[in-house]
């Protein structure tokens, strides 16, 4: 049976049926609709003002690749300039290939690229070194705790180096729905109260962040990359399989099978969520060591690095779990091997 005509142009044959709306579109019309929806998200949310210098968190994966491609196409209409900022976490056999994809993208799209490395920023620590230090727990999920916190700090540092005024990341609707589920399952009222918006305004001197793909499903991100023939890196991080996010992802897939709108329902619910004032987190202060935003004496990054340098990474994870990155999980303090004493906690 031949494919129906495209519901938009009526000239070409439809190449896909949009997962949520059911609309049959050709590849060109789907890509145009996808870009228009991202443009609407940016304009309606007033995410990127004219003249903004935007640091795109570039990982080489499908989401950041699609985000960079779409924003590059929209940049003249938005009046913004783009800088690619990639983070080298120091994961052997994984990150090198991903960074190679980012470099190809930067060359093809003629966008400036800056790479910042954990090893340079965090006193010699790489994710492989962190994994060896936390190996006593017998689990890899704590690696995602460290990596999420440190990557956020590294992206901020890279954005400042290039003179950016805003940071954008490629989180899509599925990512956000998983985060809502994770925070709900943990009973993390603070993150539920503040995590549903399109980004953060940049309190305490931090750069404003936003997620222009927040309402785009993962399926459509993949379809856009396919029709635009984008070059991206698709392997999963070697430390990801045991992360708590994987359980939320499995649950979300089951929910979506029963209710196709489950992903966007969760995203919109998080937007509308209004918890009692008593449940909202206090206004953050400043880290006593590096000056970054912090709800305690030390920010997340300094607390984790402090635990690593003292040889007590599991204690660093367990002590303020709800204040850590969304991959954080309860930990049992262990006695991992002590890293070299020469690795000092850096001053940012």
Curated annotation (Swiss-Prot):
Metabolic or biological pathway: tRNA modification; 5-methoxycarbonylmethyl-2-thiouridine-tRNA biosynthesis
A GO biological-process term: protein urmylation
Keywords per UniProt: Cytoplasm, Phosphoprotein, RNA-binding, Transferase, tRNA processing, tRNA-binding
Top EC class for this record: transferase
Chain segments carrying region Disordered: 316-348
Molecular function terms, GO-annotated: nucleotidyltransferase activity; tRNA binding
GO terms under cellular component: cytosol; cytosolic tRNA wobble base thiouridylase complex
Localization terms from the record: Cytoplasm
Listed InterPro entries: CTU1-like_ATP-bd, CTU1_C, Ncs6/Tuc1/Ctu1, Rossmann-like_a/b/a_fold, TilS/TtcA_N, tRNA_thiolation_TtcA_Ctu1
Positions of modified residues (Phosphoserine): 200
Keyword tRNA processing attached: yes
Signal peptide positions (record): none
Protein EC: 2.7.7.-
Entry function: Plays a central role in 2-thiolation of mcm(5)S(2)U at tRNA wobble positions of tRNA(Lys), tRNA(Glu) and tRNA(Gln). Directly binds tRNAs and probably acts by catalyzing adenylation of tRNAs, an intermediate required for 2-thiolation. It is unclear whether it acts as a sulfurtransferase that transfers sulfur from thiocarboxylated URM1 onto the uridine of tRNAs at wobble position.
Oligomeric form and interacting partners: Component of a complex at least composed of URM1, CTU2/NCS2 and CTU1/ATPBD3. May form a heterodimer with CTU2/NCS2.
Family listed: Belongs to the TtcA family. CTU1/NCS6/ATPBD3 subfamily.
Protein name: Cytoplasmic tRNA 2-thiolation protein 1
Species name: Homo sapiens
Gene: CTU1
């Amino acid at each position: 049976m031949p494919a129906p005509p495209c519901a938009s142009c009526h000239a070409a044959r439809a190449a896909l049926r949009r997962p949520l709306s059911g609309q049959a579109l050709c590849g060109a019309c789907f890509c145009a609709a996808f870009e228009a929806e991202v443009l609407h998200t940016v304009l309606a949310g007033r995410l990127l003002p004219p003249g903004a210098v935007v640091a795109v968190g570039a990982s080489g994966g499908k989401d950041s690749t699609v985000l960079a491609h779409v924003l590059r196409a929209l940049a003249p209409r938005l009046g913004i300039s783009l800088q690619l900022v990639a983070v080298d976490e120091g994961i052997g056999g994984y990150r090198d290939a991903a960074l190679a994809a980012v470099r190809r993208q930067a060359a093809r799209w003629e966008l400036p690229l800056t790479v910042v490395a954990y090893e340079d920023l965090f006193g010699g620590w790489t994710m492989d070194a962190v994994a060896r230090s936390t190996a006593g727990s017998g689990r890899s999920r704590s690696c995602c705790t460290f990596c999420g916190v440190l990557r956020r700090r590294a992206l901020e540092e890279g954005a400042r180096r290039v003179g950016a005024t805003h940071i954008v990341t490629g989180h899509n609707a599925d990512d956000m729905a998983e985060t809502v589920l994770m925070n709900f399952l943990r009973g993390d009222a603070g993150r539920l109260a503040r995590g549903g918006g399109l980004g953060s305004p940049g309190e305490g001197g931090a750069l404003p962040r936003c997620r222009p793909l927040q309402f785009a499903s993962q399926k459509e991100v993949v379809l856009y990359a396919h029709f635009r023939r984008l070059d991206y890196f698709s392997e999963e991080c070697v430390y990801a399989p045991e992360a708590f996010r994987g359980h939320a992802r499995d649950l979300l897939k089951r929910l979506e099978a029963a209710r196709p709108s489950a992903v966007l329902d969760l995203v919109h619910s998080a937007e509308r969520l209004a918890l009692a004032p008593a449940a909202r987190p206090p206004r953050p202060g400043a880290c006593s060591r590096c000056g970054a935003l912090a709800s305690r004496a030390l920010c997340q990054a300094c607390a984790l690095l402090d635990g690593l340098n003292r040889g007590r990474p599991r204690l660093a994870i367990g002590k303020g779990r709800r204040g850590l990155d969304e991959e954080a999980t309860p930990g049992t303090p262990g006695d991992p091997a002590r890293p070299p004493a020469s690795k000092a906690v850096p001053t940012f």
